[in-house]
Amino acid sequence: MTTVAQKHFLEGQTYSVPLIQPDLRREEAVQQVADALQYLQKVSGDIFNRISQRVETSRAQLQAISERVTLAQAKIEKIKGSKKAIKVFSSAKYPAPERLQEYCSIFAGAEDPSKQKWPRHKIQSKHRMLDEKSLQEKLKYFPVCVNTKIHQEDDAEEGLGSLPRNISSLSSLLLFNTTENLYKKYVFLDPLAGAVTKTHVALETETEEKLFDAPLSITERGQLDRQVAENYFYVPDLGQVPEIDVPSYLPDLPGIAADLMYSADLGPGIAPSAPSSAIPELPTFSTESVEPSQADLQDPGLLPPPPPPPPPPPPVMPTTVPPPPPLPQPTAPSEPARTASEDSSKTVPAASVQGAPKEVVNPSTGRASLLESIRQAGGIGKANLRSVKERKLEKKKQKEQEQVRATGQGGDLMSDLFNKLVLRRKGISGKGPGASANPDAPGSPAGAFARMSDSIPPLPPPQQPPGEEDEDDWES
């Protein structure tokens, strides 16, 4: 009967070819060699079959990729010479499966042929006798390492020695209430105090412990350099771009589209952009030029006075001209001066522009249209303006009325006291009701001041040229 050598398996190893042992009988060695060669043939055949299947699978995948490349190349060749703009849509996701296929080993599912039942052979020859001489010859070629070193016992024993035979439990082996094995390492330890474990050698050689040396930053008065944190963020840079002086448009170029202005349904955008409805659409205005009337070109002295015109419609203003600000209301003495200036302004252009073109006589500029709109609005005479002095007097009267109401509505002690103090101050200053009731009394200071002010003649009003009044005193 043949014996097969023991096989040693590795991690992930599927096949294992047996080795033939030496010093076998001839018939036994021949049988083991035949069985090993037969096993090796089966293993090699299985390995090459699996490699061929994997190569065929990879070749099919490569063929599919080649077909896709050929199809894409044909599409590129078809549109290569076209001059029309082509819209290309890109997929939002990468064209790959969500879950990648895991790698499968080429030997997945393989079975070891050695697990099959081998035939049994009956050997007729007998074993040879052991020969010491042949064994000594083999030791020359097959070195045998034998550890002949004698283990020397340790002189310094730390524990109590070997374990006694009468120990029957773990509690009798360890020191009470601790995890120390005294037979292995003898320690001086109080089981109830929980002190630090110290051997008798450490107790004998124990010395005073010193503090560690100070670090170099303290002893040498050195300062550590602050490390600058490295920035690993991606900062794109345009880099060096060469300057090329070429025209902006080159017609009839091969492979360049000429009809870039095309309309197509783009659909919803990918990036979050601002909605187009946020920009308001401005209305369109029709700009009408203000044509001068023929009456302005004629002499106003030869024409009869025109009838009162109807109320004019709102003037059509250009989009760029702002509305005119209101002008101050003139006083009565400035009316004749204004009419005289208007008559002179009408007569002077009529006399100086004889034979001039229409555009020169009446320029249609923004300033002329602004003056025309002011004339149509009525000018200074129709403006509803009010003097600032009148407004100040009204505010003063309103303030006095509020104070009188406050004095009449007082109900508590503090308000009555406050009102009396106010009346006393007014009486002292000559502004109270007592002073105004009897201004001619000899002891009243208000009456004396009033008589002195009456004796002083009023100042004449300042003479101002017409049209140069202070505009700060007028408010709409």
From Swiss-Prot:
Domain WH2 span(s) in chain numbering: 366-388
Ranges annotated as biased composition (Acidic residues): 467-476
Disulfide bond annotation, renumbered to this chain: none
Source taxon at top rank: Eukaryota
InterPro entries documented for this protein: WASH1 (IPR028290), WASH1_WAHD (IPR021854), WH2_dom (IPR003124)
Gene Ontology biological process terms, A to Z: Arp2/3 complex-mediated actin nucleation; endocytic recycling; endosomal transport; exocytosis; protein transport; retrograde transport, endosome to Golgi
Residue ranges of the region described as Disordered: 273-412, 427-476
TM region positions: none
Residue span of region Required for WASH complex assembly: 1-54
Basic and acidic residues compositional bias, start-end: 387-403
Keyword set includes Membrane: yes
VCA: annotated segments: 354-476
Family according to the record: Belongs to the WASH1 family.
Role: Acts as a nucleation-promoting factor at the surface of endosomes, where it recruits and activates the Arp2/3 complex to induce actin polymerization, playing a key role in the fission of tubules that serve as transport intermediates during endosome sorting.
Protein name according to UniProt: WASH complex subunit 1
Organism: Gallus gallus (Chicken)
